[in-house]
């Protein structure tokens, strides 16, 4: 980077600093790095798309005017998103820098460069799934095949799948890695049938080394897709190729999934990801702030981690919302500001927060039982049936895993929870009185 470029930018930001509050300057301007200054073009590196958008809409004119004051020239400002630490290399080879990710063919471009093992925050809620994913990445088709990862929305399943793909490509660039959503797989199958290109479709998915399929639950009920995926699975498995699958639920709970597929999904290892605990939520927020170069007080992160418990996407979204709110209102980031910025999100989440304790209390009252009865070993119908209903509702209305639900009902096995869920689900299709009871219980739970 030239001395002239550095000196020009340092003088410019000193001018800009006098026009902004400290929080706005530190949040938006401090993270900018100059790349090049040529003719009438000034290229500036910014850490992410969100920052780029804010700079373009709110601070671009300020930068242009500061440079004009210094040089008497009006520059065209070009913000370039980059996470590279060496801006000099970016200037020389911007189009080829890929942030230490191997990009060797068409398939690898389907992987998100941000989703690596290094950027994944490990906690008690995801430690097992992370360890299993890393083991598969280190020894494809030798550790666990298939690897089936399940969990709620926004908990990191897709992140781990992309991380596996990146790790394998980094260590073996010649590997044929394919990442696809089940929806895309279905659409490609439909198009291959329509265009009479079945052979090409099968070659694409059966002559590879690694297949990563996201959201497999969406093939449920699609007979032709299940048929094709069954044969694809068999071809890869028999050729000793690695298969990684993700879903929002375990294989046994995917409705209208063919038994032959269900059994194959259970051949390898099933790993679940649960909602992050407080310590993990704090680590996620600190990692996000560090990556995005955001200056967030620790007490604000504690506030976010305390109020938002469901998933990673909402945590990170809350952080960005607070930063944007601070910038747009020219107020320092504080707990009070965070409370104001997140009031809509937090109030709506608090009204719909449902716990197993609440469900047990409502069900016990409805059936004139004690909560201890639902947790007891007694199996008389007047207790066993309400217990099954409570387990069913716990599965439907909370993010708790099957083992956790079983634990809350007297330490029962997760298979007992599955049996209860399936029994109530089946009975609901034909029992009107049960439908009425479930509706009433839902009302009472929502009123809590």
Swiss-Prot record:
Residues 1-73 are annotated as: Domain I, interacts with DnaA modulators. One of its GO terms (molecular function) is DNA replication origin binding. Its main location: cytoplasm. It is found in: Cytoplasm. GO terms for biological process: DNA replication initiation; regulation of DNA replication. It holds the Pfam family Bac_DnaA_C. Oligomerizes as a right-handed, spiral filament on DNA at oriC. This is Chromosomal replication initiator protein DnaA. The lineage of its organism: Bacteria, Bacillati, Bacillota, Clostridia, Eubacteriales.
């Amino acid at each position: 980077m030239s001395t002239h470029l550095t000196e020009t930018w340092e003088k410019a930001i000193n001018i800009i600093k006098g026009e902004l509050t400290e929080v706005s300057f530190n949040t938006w301007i401090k993270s900018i790095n100059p790349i090049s200054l040529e003719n009438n073009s000034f290229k500036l590196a910014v850490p992410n798309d969100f920052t780029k958008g804010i700079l373009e809409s709110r601070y671009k004119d300020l930068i242009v005017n500061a440079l004009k004051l210094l040089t008497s020239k009006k520059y065209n400002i070009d913000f370039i998103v980059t996470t590279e630490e060496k801006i000099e290399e970016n200037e020389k080879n911007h189009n080829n820098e890929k942030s230490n990710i191997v990009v060797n063919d068409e398939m690898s471009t389907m992987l998100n460069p941000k989703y690596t093992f290094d950027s994944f925050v490990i906690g008690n809620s995801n430690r097992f799934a992370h360890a299993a994913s890393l083991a598969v990445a280190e020894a494809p088709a030798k550790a666990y095949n298939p690897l089936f990862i399940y969990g709620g929305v926004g908990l990191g399943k897709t992140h781990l799948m992309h991380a596996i793909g990146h790790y394998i490509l980094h260590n073996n660039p010649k590997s044929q890695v394919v990442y696809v959503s089940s929806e895309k797989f279905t659409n490609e199958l439909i198009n291959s049938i329509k265009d009479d290109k079945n052979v090409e479709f099968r070659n694409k998915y059966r002559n590879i080394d690694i297949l990563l399929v996201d959201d497999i639950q969406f093939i449920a009920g699609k007979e032709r897709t299940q048929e094709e995926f069954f044969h694809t699975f068999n071809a890869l498995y028999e050729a000793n190729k690695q298969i990684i699958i993700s879903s929002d639920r375990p294989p046994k709970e995917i409705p209208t999934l063919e038994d032959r597929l269900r059994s194959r999904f259970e051949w390898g290892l099933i790993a679940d990801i649960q909602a992050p605990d407080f310590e993990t939520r704090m680590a996620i927020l600190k990692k996000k702030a560090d990556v995005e170069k955001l200056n967030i007080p620790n007490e604000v992160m504690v506030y976010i981690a305390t109020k938002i418990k469901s998933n990673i996407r909402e945590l990170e979204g809350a952080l960005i919302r607070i930063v944007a709110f601070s910038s747009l209102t020219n107020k320092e980031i504080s707990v009070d500001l965070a409370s104001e910025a997140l009031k809509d999100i937090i109030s709506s989440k608090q009204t719909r927060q449902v716990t197993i304790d609440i469900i047990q209390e409502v069900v016990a009252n409805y059936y004139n039982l004690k909560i201890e009865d639902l947790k007891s070993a007694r199996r008389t119908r007047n207790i066993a049936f309400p217990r099954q209903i409570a387990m069913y509702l716990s599965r439907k209305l909370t993010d708790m895993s099957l083992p956790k639900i079983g634990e809350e009902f007297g330490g029962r096995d997760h298979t007992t929870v599955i049996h209860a869920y399936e029994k109530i689900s089946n009975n609901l299709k034909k029992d009107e009185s049960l439908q009425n009871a479930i509706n009433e219980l839902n009302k009472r739970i929502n009123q809590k």
